[in-house]
């Protein structure tokens, strides 16, 4: 699929859920937990899925496991929404080889490539890293700027430089409203700007962004859908009221390191997504109690 074709598909995807990875007690992936979870997400207005991203605990998934997840979710979704595969690492060569492998699958719509972590590259190094990935296959690339996790930030002007590459079609921007506004104002026509911060979904959409790549949409998809509908209709006050209502719930989902809180909530709702792989650990009983109370309030 060409970059232009993927962009057209993503223009319909305002709420993209970064899918969790369910685990069994022995730490193996619980593929049996995916069908109900995925079907309920699509029913509550998830319009695209990120597979093997941060919320999926990608640092503790092997590439073989990621490929198994891609195949499983593709079979469940059957083309109903775009599938975006996490393909980025802090090793450019590894990322290049993996995106080549993912591109051959034929059913992945785009690759999500995170800023290289730990290495602390310069802006030129960041540019060359993403350029190498984008040039490695025909699979379009979404940049993933999340300095809170990886320390190094893709500065806005570097994103604009990367946006000139034909195969770089969007950004998941996990910084500030100032950066969102600057990017939305200055990116080339057709380049899509998503916030990766659930609490900034209202701001991103009202500024003219595409939408949100979300953790909270596991449980708040309907609310995001209604908020975006109000914005589209010009009813900003009504949209803001929804934002104010859901913000405490969103904050609860990030009160300890994600994805522990969303897994706590999903398990409480009967989705059997299990625990986390070390070095991440589950919420304590007290943390879980507070999170669930806030979500159910």
Curated annotation (Swiss-Prot):
Q: Print the keywords alphabetically.
A: Amino-acid biosynthesis, Cytoplasm, Diaminopimelate biosynthesis, Lyase, Lysine biosynthesis, Schiff base
Q: Give GO cellular component annotations, separated by semicolons.
A: cytosol
BP terms from Gene Ontology: diaminopimelate biosynthetic process; lysine biosynthetic process via diaminopimelate
What CDD domains does the annotation carry?
Answer: DHDPS
| Compartments in which it is found | Cytoplasm
Enzyme class, spelled out: lyase
Tell me the residue numbers annotated for binding pyruvate.
55, 213
InterPro entries in UniProt: Aldolase_TIM (IPR013785), DapA (IPR005263), DapA-like (IPR002220), Schiff_base-form_aldolases_AS (IPR020625)
Q: Where is the active site?
A: 144 (proton donor/acceptor), 172 (schiff-base intermediate with substrate)
UniProt cross-references to Pfam families, sorted A to Z = DHDPS
Q: What is its EC number?
A: 4.3.3.7
Quick one: which pathway? Amino-acid biosynthesis; L-lysine biosynthesis via DAP pathway; (S)-tetrahydrodipicolinate from L-aspartate: step 3/4
> Quaternary form?
Homotetramer; dimer of dimers.
Alphabetized HAMAP family for the sequence: DapA
Protein purpose? Catalyzes the condensation of (S)-aspartate-beta-semialdehyde [(S)-ASA] and pyruvate to 4-hydroxy-tetrahydrodipicolinate (HTPA).
User: What does the similarity note say?
Assistant: Belongs to the DapA family.
Protein's name in the database: 4-hydroxy-tetrahydrodipicolinate synthase
Organism field: Lactococcus lactis subsp. cremoris (strain SK11)
Q: What is the lineage of its organism?
A: Bacteria, Bacillati, Bacillota, Bacilli, Lactobacillales
Designated gene of the protein:
dapA
